[in-house]
């Protein structure tokens, strides 16, 4: 920058080049060329202005001139007063006095100049003014280059910033400069502020350019986030971006808000990918089978809430039937999740596992239902073929047992009650039980045919069907007729509905004394048995006749009727026949009772030890 140059007189009388730094009341702050002397204050009397540049250089012999020379090697060159002694071509012989000595020297014209006629400066030679600088502009005003245009505009010789006083010092040789400074100082400071801001932006842009050039060869990731998910990606007050920038190895993150594009730069692929996981939010749907939607949601949304919490997704939306935003598969319901890419992957894994678990549970449930159905079919399926006489003789034990196993809460009996420890023969599906029941039925059937004539004379009510009831039941009361008739109907039509026992039982309990029903059931019982000879009557026939005869006038059968009937028959029958009939009846009842118990317990056949209850019933004790 152009300096205010002056000439300072030294102690040897030579004038040396110097620069004015500041103006004081009676002196100037002067700095010297090449700093051969330190900056110091010089009085006005020792300072003069240099000659103007347009001064004519016409030198002749005998004239006084000034020579640019030095007295010794330690001092710089200065202007000394000299005299031309001789001229020869471009060379001059000069004589000058220095340090109390006279020197002669041959020099060229460039080292000579006419004598400087400028006098020493005074207080009025220089004009000084100052401009206060705001605090935010002090650093910018330290550079003299910032005042280049201002100096030119005001016509100042020098403008410098004084850190001690925080002001701009303007030096000039004209008084007009002071007026111009007062006019342009505010504009100059404002322009400095604007230029400072622009320079700052330029510096940032330059740094960004340099960093971009460096990052261009580094690792980077670029992805786009939907406009409606930008808020989640940025986070509250930019928390997600700040968290991504704190990832070790991430150097820069750029965001184009117009397009929703993120650019992540880093030192490694792992660092860039980790930062991307914080910022990349998306929406994805998972297809759930319609029959599993309720189980996936859970009671009060407990299951789906647990899945959301564990996966880390932001929210979940279940698409309705009327929503057509997403493609829908047949029989499937879309579950739409919003979250980071990692959380979406987590929720897909959780749902796939949960659906697989629900399918396995459903498969196990179906297998259980199939097993139960097979058990029912096994219980109902051992029906005898009508064309095989052997099966007819064995009876239909499995049908009766299956009906008992299906309706476990209801017992298929009439009015008579049984003990709580009694187990019906209809309730087992065991092969041993079936075999023992068949054998006992054969024995009971033989005993029934052998005792048919005697039982027709005696009371037939307790001997109605020894295979289908417990001997203990005779002492407590007779069973309803409906149960015997219903069982007879099942025996007659094994291919029919075995559950008709329930209907017949209910009917017999409500209308037990219906005469027409009794006659119809009697005819069924008669047809259900095969006679061995045409002359013999079956046990069912005898029981049917006795049943018809035992009806009272009002159609009800009481225990007293059985007791009185038994006493009257015992009086009419001789003791020998009575003992014989009792003995035969006991033997037949023992066989049938033992077979029923065997079918229930599936234990060994203890036919040789009749129960005490059977004896008690035979003796007529209830």
Swiss-Prot record:
GO terms for cellular component: cytoplasmic stress granule; intracellular membraneless organelle; neuron projection; nucleus; presynapse. InterPro entries: Agenet-like_dom, FMR1, FMR1-like_C_core, FMRP_KH0, FXR1_C1, FXR_C3, KH_dom, KH_dom_type_1. Disruption phenotype: Morpholino knockdown of the protein causes abnormalities of striated muscle development and abnormal development of the heart, including failure of looping and snapping of the atrium from its venous pole. CDD domains: KH_I_FXR1_rpt1, KH_I_FXR1_rpt2, KH_I_FXR1_rpt3, Tudor_Agenet_FXR1_rpt1, Tudor_Agenet_FXR1_rpt2. Residues 455-468, 574-596 have a biased composition (Basic and acidic residues). Its main location: cytoplasm. Residues 353-379 are annotated as: CC2 domain. Residues 218-279, 281-351 form the KH domain. It comes from the Eukaryota. Phosphorylation at Ser-447 by PAK1 promotes its activity. The keyword Nuclease does not apply. GO terms for biological process: animal organ development; dentate gyrus development; heart development; membraneless organelle assembly; mRNA destabilization; mRNA transport; muscle cell development; negative regulation of inflammatory response. Residues 400-409, 425-437, 545-555 have a biased composition (Polar residues). The modification Phosphoserine is found at residue 447. Disordered region at the C-terminus undergoes liquid-liquid phase separation (LLPS) for the formation of a membraneless compartment that stores mRNAs. CC1 and CC2 domains are required for homodimerization and FXR1-network nucleation. CC domains also mediate interaction with other proteins containing similar CC domains. PANTHER family: FRAGILE X MENTAL RETARDATION SYNDROME-RELATED PROTEIN, RNA-BINDING PROTEIN FXR1. This is RNA-binding protein FXR1. It comes from Danio rerio.
